[in-house]
Amino acid sequence: MSDSQTLVVKLGTSVLTGGSRRLNRAHIVELVRQCAQLHAAGHRIVIVTSGAIAAGREHLGYPELPATIASKQLLAAVGQSRLIQLWEQLFSIYGIHIGQMLLTRADMEDRERFLNARDTLRALLDNNIVPVINENDAVATAEIKVGDNDNLSALAAILAGADKLLLLTDQQGLFTADPRTNPQAELIKDVYGIDDALRAIAGDSVSGLGTGGMGTKLQAADVACRAGIDTIIAAGSKPGVIGDVMAGISAGTRFHAQASPLENRKRWIFGAPPAGEITVDEGATSAILERGSSLLPKGIKSVTGNFSRGEVIRIRNQEGRDIAHGVTRYNSDALRRIAGHHSQQIDAILGYEYGPVAVHRDDMITR
């Protein structure tokens, strides 16, 4: 075993249930055994767990509920305590303490809360405690609608300063086509950069209990790799998969980390869920992507959502493609008023100004 490393393991609902309606406790026991073995060898382990909704449904006897957000939140509220109790019981067999962290998008959108979450997570690791992380499903409406503990695990990996992120799923990895419908599909073993062609071949999970698919796993891999974290998508059912990944043995699809990872502040910008979005014209698109320029108000065509100065927003071209994320220097109302105008007109329009740019290039990450 090499020197101590930090590994974030994301366990999807399909892995925890084996594709059934209830938690597969025997399989979870085996996953905990693998994690405990690495922990005993001096490695730092972080668990990002799905399954709260599935656990709640099982505990309540599979009630027939309307397909609403409130129903999912009800199940999550019941299931979260059952889920964390299970993790605690299983890790205690090996004398390992766990610490629960429930996060929401707001914890990532706000820089101060992001740093507080980072400090808490690293304090747990420094004291040999295994953090068990989940999205706060009972209150995080946006997470359940869009859903994805995949992206949450990438953010957890950034918070933890992880060396590797392992996304365990019900598939062997990323294939050249959907292996369920195309027998010619081949496993892609190594990925050195995520592009539109790769996104186009990503299929969705068939599990009806979870909320993520292969598309969200690609998003998570993109975020983690750009932060300097190797990411692996592999089958949770593969014997010894967690130990194999830590030992560098080939398993599933490996997304290789960028050689020059983003600095800490830009990791936050890249990982934070956008509070809104703006659409920019062709000139602004070229300036941002080709010359690394700041975004001026003149290039803004439209503003979507309500957000405050200092929040992370998405920047899109007129075809609707994401080109960057950045910290806005003006709130959404102000941007709507100065959109399409020259920077010299900002003070006359608003009665104040925070500088000539809408998003500075130092506060921007291109996609």
Curated annotation (Swiss-Prot):
Q: Which residues bind substrate?
A: S50, D137, N149
Recite the UniProt keywords alphabetically.
Amino-acid biosynthesis, ATP-binding, Cytoplasm, Kinase, Nucleotide-binding, Proline biosynthesis, Transferase
> What is the purpose of this protein?
Catalyzes the transfer of a phosphate group to glutamate to form L-glutamate 5-phosphate.
- Reaction catalysed? L-glutamate + ATP = L-glutamyl 5-phosphate + ADP
Identify the EC number(s).
2.7.2.11
* InterPro entries according to UniProt: AceGlu_kinase-like_sf, Asp/Glu/Uridylate_kinase, G5K_ProB, Glu/AcGlu_kinase, Glu_5kinase, Glu_5kinase/COase_Synthase, Glutamate_5-kinase_CS, PUA
Principal location class: cytoplasm
- Domain named PUA is located at 275-353
State the NCBIfam families in the record: proB
Question: Which pathway does the database say it acts in?
Answer: Amino-acid biosynthesis; L-proline biosynthesis; L-glutamate 5-semialdehyde from L-glutamate: step 1/2
GO: which molecular function terms?
A: ATP binding; glutamate 5-kinase activity; RNA binding
Q: Which organism is it from?
A: Citrobacter koseri (strain ATCC BAA-895 / CDC 4225-83 / SGSC4696)
Starting at the broadest rank, the lineage of the source organism is: Bacteria, Pseudomonadati, Pseudomonadota, Gammaproteobacteria, Enterobacterales
HAMAP family per UniProt: ProB
Q: Where does ATP bind?
A: K10, T169, D170, T211, G212, G213, M214, G215, T216, K217
Indicate the enzyme's highest-level EC class.
transferase
Q: Give the source's domain of life in one word.
A: Bacteria
Subcellular location, record wording: Cytoplasm
Pfam annotation, one family: PUA
One GO biological process term = L-proline biosynthetic process
The UniProt family comment states: Belongs to the glutamate 5-kinase family.
User: What is the protein's given name?
Assistant: Glutamate 5-kinase
| Gene Ontology cellular component annotations, sorted alphabetically | cytosol
Query: Which chain regions cross the lipid bilayer?
Result: none
